[in-house]
């Protein structure tokens, strides 16, 4: 943890979009106490962090993203050129063989088991002859499940993917990659113990980019630069698609992260765009549940670029998304657990991949997954707990994949709940109600949901959901989007801003704010503290390096 430092007094000169001036001044008072959390950094801190990274030599590595538990590391890596023989990962001098995740030998994984909890290891990748391929670096295991750590810090955000190509009619589709990297660097400058990247690591929609007025621009300004159109009639790994697929993912994942996360365990959750489509339903296209080409694409992206979720003693190995050929043993591609001793448990779940259309019986996640989520929510065997769904609770923008029936009335420009929503299933909301009921029934822990997908930052406490009233509110945090450009914010793309769902009673600490950003989550035995950082062009890019929170939101433990 960085040492406490006095926050800069020059931060924040105007209220973020979505906040009144009065709200902003009130929240500014909370932000002034940031030094007590040890969050604020001197102006030179980011420069020092960047310089230290510059001094680390990545060698032939193109990218590297690790996962960790209390006894295991799982690392995905790619190299600038294929390796003809398998590399080794040295772990405190012990060799672990690399396993190829592509046919050419550019992509490799390293699965390190039998480690000691809360222990820092020195890692180094060497070639088959023992020659180093990059500098050594440290990586630490998490505390044992029964340990009692004093604190934990998490960096969380959503929607980091996207190609920052030429503007269309003066509007950007995704944030410039340089600014995106600086936002990531600013978040990493706070020395998080873990990173949660919640969904949409890739934006390369196929059908749902070609049913829009800007379809030609997508083909000419994006697809042609990466080799043309992907062929949906064959898998992404097919020779027709392999080169294009790899260029796209190299740019959006490898190009953003490089080796930045090498010493920080990461949790990459998937969402709709990771299956190469937006969630839509009309008379020509329906993208939920995802088609096989998208599902295979999401699996292949993860197989090569970022780790699956490591096993947890309280998560059944038979859940969907696990137990597949080619995956590391006992891991899961869609449902995961972040367990940090007895301090925190977080459950992560993809809300798109296994969604079904069974009407009143429909589910967003399968029954086995719902059973696991409810059981872990009711266990109350950690000081704190939160859900990390890829689909937000409490908020709506009227799109197909929402938990809610809310629909945009194009005549009034407002959400309505009294019109049929094409493609939407009543069973989705019924499952939503079962999940929030379990959250709201906790006796010792505050109910918290940390969520992604929506291109906004927001914080609110939900006291009612349809017929359910909660004795203690459910705190819903939208962590902020790293990669969204002008055209991707709901007010532009859907002609409506995100807002609390019509069936929800919500006290808003920060109304949905269409800016780029991230959230730092500090966890101690007494409370969780969420610090939300906001920035958006035309604000100066240099301002990112000293960015301070727009909101500091505390959630104490109930008992």
Segments the model singles out, each with a brief description of its role:
Residues 1-5, 14, 40, 98, ...:
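Selective for proline/serine-rich intrinsically disordered segments
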Residues 31, 38-39, 312, 316:
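Short, polar/charged, Gly/Pro-enriched helix-capping and turn/loop motifs at alpha-helix termini
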Residues 7-11, 42, 46-47, 331:
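A detector of low-complexity, intrinsically disordered, Ser/Thr/Gly/Pro/Ala-rich segments
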Residues 32-33, 129:
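Residue-level detector of secondary-structure transition/capping positions
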Residues 17-26, 33-52, 159:
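N-terminal twin-arginine translocation
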Residues 1-20, 30:
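N-terminal secretory signal peptides
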Residues 26, 50-559:
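Metal-dependent phosphoester/phosphodiester hydrolase catalytic core
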